[in-house]
Amino acid sequence: DHSDNGLIDGCNFYFPSCHKRMLGIIDTPPDISIFSNSKNGTVIRSAFRYTDGSALEMYSDGHTIEDCYFYHIDYTATDLNGLMTTIQMGGAGNIFRKNTMHKLGASATLNPGNEALIEFNNIYDTGHMQSDGAIIQCMVGQQPGVEIRYNWLHDTIKYGARFDGNGEGNNGLMHHNVIWNVEGGIMVKGYDHSLYNNTAFDNGSKNDIIVMIDQGGNQGTSTKNNAANKISGHRSGTYSDYPVPGNYENNWNGYETGTDIKSLLMDPENYDFRPLPNSLLVNAGINIEGITDDYVGEAPDIGAYEHGGEFWRAGISWDLSTTFGDNFHPPNLLYSVEKNPMSFDYKLKQNYPNPFNLNTTLSYHVARSGMINISIYDLMGRNIKTLVNGFQKSGLTSVVWDATNDEGHEVAAGLYFYKMEAGNFRRT
């Protein structure tokens, strides 16, 4: 909080957050990794695994999440922020780059803030715990100035990338993304958006690229140089029934060609989405300033890759297993503490019955004759009743609690703890 220009570099977060449900607390969100009231923070080359709740939240402007690995995030999907996302970024000018994310629970994966840059990410296997949503979710106010480029979005029951909301969003840019095996590749509501050189295929019952006729109408939206099996102005309707609104040029649309885009790609099963030499995609596009300036040949190619151009890859640049390992190993202690050998001889056993109505029995073992204290506490840590406070001989013994406090009044139903203290021994 209030820490501008903070840096997290090379950290391994393994089970970093956990709800308190096992303590009977159900209305308190877990403590997660969060930047609040802080600008220009950077999280780089770090791993986040097994979080109960969202993985990371960064608010205010100018944050960067780069080259990070996220796995098995938000496995309960409770007590999330309002939009229900794995990564929540607020403010403006954020960068989300070269990250790998998979096995995610929340309905939406990334909410990037305003005027964000999202590039070179490999994100898949998302949205297991909630309905609706998209891997990259941009609401109305986040669409002007956002740029989503060079990403692999795949293998999920959600949309790939979506300009969402009530149709008032505008001026968002998506280009050079590859989206496959999702439930709707690109979904665009609003107007004056730009969709260039995206490749999309095998995206379930919904279309690969959806430029909505409804909800904003997409007047002024430019759809050029895209390669997909199904491009339409409707979620699932055909191109002939729902022509793409706005400026629609030089796209390879399976609805028009009647063939599968995969037959024109090098080896899509092994992540090689470059066009085959002499395929119908090569030199079939049009030049778009600032987007296709580095094309090879007579004209830009259609789709996310240029034949003879850069063979870009998405996701982290390092190997998880060699960097952090696949399992958690506690760090070595900076110093050692000599343990009291007697401590291991004291034992505090589980009460019985549990739960109970009238009373319950607490059994315990005293290793050496001496002063013993056993007390009952509530969830707030308040001492409710002292059951034992005095000298006891060694051996196994027990005490009964009748669910009353020190004043003899019956306590409310709920969750309580009991604690035993004997010399250096402490157990709850």
Model regions and ranges:
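Short glycine/acidic-rich loop motifs that flank beta-strands on beta-rich extracellular proteins
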Residues: 1, 7, 17-32, 52-59, ...
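Solenoid scaffold repeats with emphasis on beta-solenoid/beta-helix
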Residues: 5-6, 11, 32, 40-42, ...
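Consensus "Asn ladder" position of solenoid repeat domains
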Residues: 11, 46, 68, 73, ...
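C-terminal accessory segments
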Residues: 255-324, 328-329
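Glycine-centered coil/turn sites that cap beta-strands in beta-rich domains
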Residues: 333-352, 356-378, 386-389, 398-401, ...
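C-terminal tail/sorting-segment detector
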Residues: 386, 391-394, 398-400, 409, ...
